[in-house]
């Protein structure tokens, strides 16, 4: 699309409007000029015209075909390349098959026929000729062909030539010297040699374009002073016999010159008489209507004695045949001076023509002799009076009707004057003696200024209406441009709104994505917190379970004695040590000596629990679960036995190797222990130690055990991967008990006499094992 696409579209719409009654050749020629000047590309122009050709309205299609015909004839090869191809021919054939309008069909056939004849010698346009032949074979009837319709004489601008130096001054082109092309000859020039600008009418370029100096001089040479050469004349005129004839006007003979001079004199005479009669008429008119007397066209003639000093012209009649008044009209100087004064003075309005024109003979026929008597003598006066009335009516505003009457009266007067002159010429009578001719001449001469004024008024009105038409066209173009600008503005606003909406959608999407990310993060944090809470709850539950398990295990590890301490006191002294209930109150069914577990968790737990309702081996364990084969006491071997047991396996803590860990064994009660004590426990005779405590009343007995504390209780807690302790070794006499090794420093160590120990029986452990009662320090 070229630079003038908007103008081209408007012109094309105007040239193909369905409201047209005839072809708009002005718009079509402007379209051709736009294409030839290069303002509109040929491809774009032809495609736009094709769209109009395919319009449903047959009038638009017909006018579009007219535009295409003119463009092909006037715009040269570029348009020919776009039209004379297979695609365009196929489109025209399809349109011919679809179209039902006769005029459009005939126009398509006419164009194909004309193009086939015009491009018959062009090999690259052979498709047009082939299409024409195919359509003839198919039976299409083409209209009558005229060879003049296929004359395509459209000159186009030459192609530009490329070179490295100026075509005129041979200057090499470089960075500072730019290339320029002449639009007239197509050669390449520098800036100095192509500094002129001119229009090129032969190429249809009506705007000033860059041309070289020789082409500028050739295009703008002066026409005056230069005769047109024979090469500029058309060849038809040069070959015709008219060119051989002389072009000078024929010479006039003496007789014709004399008749011309007589006619001029007669006209002058009639003008003088008409002026005199007009002056008299105005006097009478102003007497009836008192008004200011207007300035007459020319003052009355002065006396002949004071004006005429030159002799009478030889061409005038003889003195005895001419009256004295006629003699003064023969003075040429007088009439020349009279004409100068008439030009300087204002001329009155033309008179109103007669309502009933005078009778006149048929035009072009000879007038008989008696016609002269048929003309009334009052015709000049009547015509003059009518002219005055017309001037008054015209000044009062009756323009159209007055113009028509004036033109009709003038036509009648001129016709009568011509017929009278012809009649006098046929009869050989001099016009100077015909008063009717003189009066008619006077009336026509009087109406002549009014006719000129009327022509001027009509020209002014024509110019005025043409100006209005131009303004209307400008307004129409401005409205079209304004509508286009409004449409562009609306489109711009729509695009801006779409862009704003798109930006808003993008921002909303971004915000939504950010909120989604925040939500995901929040949900992830909540999930982590929930998992952490679940883990904490699970850990707490596991800890509670572990504590419960530890409690159960610790309870299971604690020995439960169902025999009261009173029964132990009744036991014989030879069977074992008597434990006196000299500690704090103990719970039934449990073993809790005073001072042994104070401050430990087990002490607090047992002290806070209520007394069980029934006595048994252990509150949380059923009595039936007690195994009678288990030993009924903790076994604490001597130091040598403890070292030997520690060396046998990795079990047990390494911090206190002097003792071996105990293994809790549920017992059946103190009855079994008391019954077996005289057999398993050796006789211990040791003086009482100060600082030792035990359930022996006033006698203190030292036992072979380590003090019971929380540090020594740690290895027995669950969760320690400690194997079971080695089996208890029997007590060996002669060794020092463990409690003497760990005795407090307040007293000297006590010597323990050897005690005879019997080996355990091979029977059940409840009957053959040696039991020792635990004493807490």
Swiss-Prot record:
Phosphorylated on Tyr-334. A minor site of phosphorylation on Tyr-329 is detected. Phosphorylation occurs in response to EGF, IL-2, GM-CSF and HGF. InterPro entries: ENTH_VHS, HGS/VPS27, HRS_helical, UIM_dom, VHS_dom, Znf_FYVE, Znf_FYVE-rel, Znf_FYVE_PHD. It is a peripheral membrane protein. A zinc finger (FYVE-type) spans 160-220. Residues 478-777 are annotated as: Interaction with NF2. Residues 443-541 are annotated as: Interaction with SNAP25 and TRAK2. It is found in: Cytoplasm; Early endosome membrane; Endosome, Multivesicular body membrane. Residues 258-277 form the UIM domain. Residues 452-570 are annotated as: Interaction with STAM. Gene3D superfamilies: 1.20.5.1940, 1.25.40.90, Zinc/RING finger domain, C3HC4 (zinc finger). The keyword Chloroplast does not apply. This is Hepatocyte growth factor-regulated tyrosine kinase substrate. One of its GO terms (molecular function) is phosphatidylinositol binding. The gene is HGS. The modification Phosphotyrosine is found at residues 308, 329, 334. Residues 15-143 form the VHS domain. Residues 292-311, 645-658, 753-777 have a biased composition (Low complexity). Pfam families: FYVE, Hrs_helical, VHS. Keywords: Acetylation, Cytoplasm, Endosome, Membrane, Metal-binding, Phosphoprotein, Protein transport, Transport, Ubl conjugation, Zinc, Zinc-finger.
């Amino acid at each position: 699309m070229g630079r003038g696409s908007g103008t081209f579209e408007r012109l094309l719409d105007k040239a193909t409007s369905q409201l047209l009654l005839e072809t708009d050749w002005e718009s079509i020629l402007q379209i051709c000029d736009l294409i030839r000047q290069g303002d509109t590309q040929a491809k774009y122009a032809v495609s736009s015209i094709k769209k109009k050709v395919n319009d449903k309205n047959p009038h638009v299609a017909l006018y579009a075909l007219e535009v295409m015909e003119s463009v092909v004839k006037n715009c040269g090869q570029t348009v020919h390349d776009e039209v004379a191809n297979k695609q365009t021919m196929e489109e025209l054939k399809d349109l011919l098959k679809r179209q039902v309008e006769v005029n459009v069909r005939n126009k398509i056939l006419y164009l194909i026929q004309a193009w086939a004849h015009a491009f018959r010698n062009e090999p690259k346009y052979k498709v047009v000729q082939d299409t024409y032949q195919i359509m003839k074979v198919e039976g299409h009837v083409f209209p009558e062909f005229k060879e003049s319709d296929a004359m395509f004489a459209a000159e186009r601008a030459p192609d530009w030539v490329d070179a490295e130096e100026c075509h005129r001054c041979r200057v090499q082109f470089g960075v500072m010297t730019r290339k320029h092309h002449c639009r007239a000859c197509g050669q390449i020039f520098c800036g100095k040699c192509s500094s002129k600008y001119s229009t090129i009418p032969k190429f249809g370029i009506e705007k000033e374009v860059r041309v070289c100096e020789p082409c500028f001089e050739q295009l703008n040479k002066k026409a005056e002073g230069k005769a047109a050469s024979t090469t500029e004349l058309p060849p038809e005129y040069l070959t015709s016999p008219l060119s051989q004839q002389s072009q000078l006007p024929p010479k006039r003979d003496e007789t014709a010159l004399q008749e011309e001079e007589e006619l001029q004199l007669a006209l002058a005479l009639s003008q003088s008489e008409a002026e005199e009669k007009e002056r008299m008429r105005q006097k009478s008119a102003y007497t009836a209507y008192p008004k200011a007397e207007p300035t007459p066209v020319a003052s009355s003639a002065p006396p002949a004695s004071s004006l005429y000093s030159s002799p009478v012209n030889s061409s005038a009649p003889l003195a005895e045949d001419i009256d004295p008044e006629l003699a003064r009209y023969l003075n040429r100087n007088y009439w020349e001076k009279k004409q100068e004064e008439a030009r300087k003075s204002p001329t009155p309005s033309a008179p109103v023509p007669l309502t009933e024109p005078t009778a006149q003979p048929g035009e072009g026929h000879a007038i008989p002799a008696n016609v002269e008597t048929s003309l009334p003598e009052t015709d000049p006066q009547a015509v003059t009076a009518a002219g005055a009335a017309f001037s008054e009516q015209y000044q009062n505003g009756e323009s159209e009707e007055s113009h028509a009457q004036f033109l009709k009266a003038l036509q009648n007067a001129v016709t009568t004057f011509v017929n009278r002159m012809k009649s006098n010429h046929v009869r050989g009578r001099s016009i100077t003696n015909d008063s009717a001719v003189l009066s008619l001449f006077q009336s026509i001469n009087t109406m002549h200024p009014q006719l000129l004024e009327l022509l001027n008024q009509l020209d002014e009105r024509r110019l005025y209406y043409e100006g209005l038409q131009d303004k209307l066209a400008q307004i129409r173009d401005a409205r079209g441009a304004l509508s286009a600008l409004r449409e562009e503005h609306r489109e711009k606003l729509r695009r801006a709104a779409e862009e704003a909406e798109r930006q808003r959608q993008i921002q909303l999407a971004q915000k939504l994505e950010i909120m989604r990310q925040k939500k995901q993060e929040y949900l992830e944090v909540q999930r982590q917190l929930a998992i952490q809470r679940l883990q904490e709850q699970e850990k707490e539950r596991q800890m509670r379970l572990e504590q419960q398990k530890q409690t159960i295990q610790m309870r299971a590890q604690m020995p439960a004695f169902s025999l009261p301490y009173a029964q132990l006191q009744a036991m014989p002294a030879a069977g074992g040590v008597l434990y006196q209930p000299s500690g704090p109150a103990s719970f039934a069914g449990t073993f809790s000596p005073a001072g042994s577990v104070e401050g430990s968790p087990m002490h607090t737990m047992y002290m806070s629990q209520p007394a069980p309702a029934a006595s048994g081996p252990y509150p949380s364990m059923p009595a039936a679960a007690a195994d009678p084969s288990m030993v009924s006491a903790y076994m604490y071997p001597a130091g040598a036995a403890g070292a030997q047991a520690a060396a046998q396996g990795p079990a047990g803590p390494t911090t206190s190797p002097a003792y071996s860990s105990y293994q809790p064994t549920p017992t059946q009660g103190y009855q079994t222990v008391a019954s077996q004590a005289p057999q398993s426990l050796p006789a211990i005779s040791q003086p009482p130690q100060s600082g030792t405590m035990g359930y022996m009343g006033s006698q203190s007995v030292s036992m072979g055990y380590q003090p019971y504390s929380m540090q020594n209780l740690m290895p027995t807690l669950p969760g320690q991967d400690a194997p079971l302790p080695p089996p208890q070794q029997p007590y060996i006499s002669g060794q020092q008990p463990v409690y003497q090794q760990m005795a407090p420093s307040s007293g000297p160590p006590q010597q323990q006499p050897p005690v005879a120990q019997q080996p355990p029986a091979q029977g059940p452990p409840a009957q053959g094992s040696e039991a020792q009662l635990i004493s807490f320090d």
